[in-house]
UniProtKB/Swiss-Prot annotation:
Residues 1-40 form a transit peptide. Belongs to the RRG9 family. Required for respiratory activity and maintenance and expression of the mitochondrial genome. The keyword Cell division does not apply. InterPro entries: NGRN/Rrg9. It comes from Pyrenophora tritici-repentis (strain Pt-1C-BFP). Residues 43-80, 225-250 are annotated as: Disordered. This is Required for respiratory growth protein 9, mitochondrial. Keywords: Mitochondrion, Transit peptide. Pfam families: Neugrin (PF06413). Its main location: mitochondrion.
């Protein structure tokens, strides 16, 4: 029995050697799995596929994408930034016109607008007031409709700011030889020190052209208080009295 098994094993080994089959002891060897390389070469490095070459001509990447199942094209949704949405809404609101920010009027100016319209409504109409104060007619209509009045504390603070502003402006005009009104002289504006003559009494007086902020349409309007003047932009000095001949002065 053992001789038969030995002859059969020897015959099997002989046949395997002729047919280039793996040796009989190959199954007993440990299997060694090849390890992956730590660093990839240029040949094995993954490359990014360029989709522009496979895209058909005339199709933009962000416009339409064709559905493979239905065969219909649908637009790709892209979120727009907030500033772009606001810009488009503002453009539609303005009707294509340029952006012109609103001019902020002081409470005293708005009160003066209401006073002008109430005293002479035929002369100081809404278009005239809008043209003079450089605001829209709709803003003038809202000012005329409003009945807001400041409190006593707000009125006192506003008058204090107004007096400081007028004192600062008239102090600068005194240095240019302009005589301040009696109200500001009583407050000490233009008062000379150490017995000197005020500048508005010297030869260097009235060197600038001073006018109020009202135009020709407002010449007949008599304000309740003094108007703070503005200096003309022409930078032309007015002739002094000493340079005018006596015959012309008389």
């Amino acid at each position: 029995m053992s001789c038969h098994n030995c002859s059969r094993t020897a015959l099997g080994l002989f046949i395997r050697s002729l047919t280039n089959i793996q040796p009989a002891f190959a199954a007993c060897r440990p299997l060694i799995h090849p390890q992956s390389l730590r660093f990839l070469s240029d040949a094995r490095r993954p490359r990014r596929v360029d989709q522009s070459a496979s895209r058909p001509d005339g199709v933009k990447p962000d416009t339409e994408i064709e559905d493979e199942l239905s065969g219909e094209g649908f637009p790709r949704k892209r979120e727009r930034p907030a500033w772009a949405i606001q810009k488009e809404a503002l453009k539609e609101k303005l009707g294509g016109e340029a952006w012109n920010p609103r001019k902020k009027l002081s409470p005293d100016t708005m009160e003066g607008i209401r006073h002008l319209n109430s005293t002479q409504p035929d002369k100081f109409t809404t278009p005239v007031l809008a043209e003079h104060f450089k605001v829209s007619p709709e803003a003038i209509r809202r000012i005329l409709k409003s009945n807001w009045k400041p409190s006593d504390k707000e009125y006192e603070e506003r008058m204090e700011r107004w007096n400081k502003r007028g004192e600062r402006i008239w102090s600068n005009l005194v240095e240019m030889g302009v005589k301040p009104p009696k109200r500001w002289r009583d407050m000490g504006v233009g008062r000379a020190r150490n017995g000197d003559v005020p500048r508005w009494k010297s030869r260097e007086r009235n060197l600038v052209d001073v006018k109020d902020s009202a135009s020709s349409d407002f010449t007949e309007y008599i304000p309740d208080e003094d108007i703070i003047p503005t200096v003309g932009k022409e930078s032309k000095s007015k002739p002094t009295t000493s340079s005018i001949p006596l015959s012309e002065r008389l």
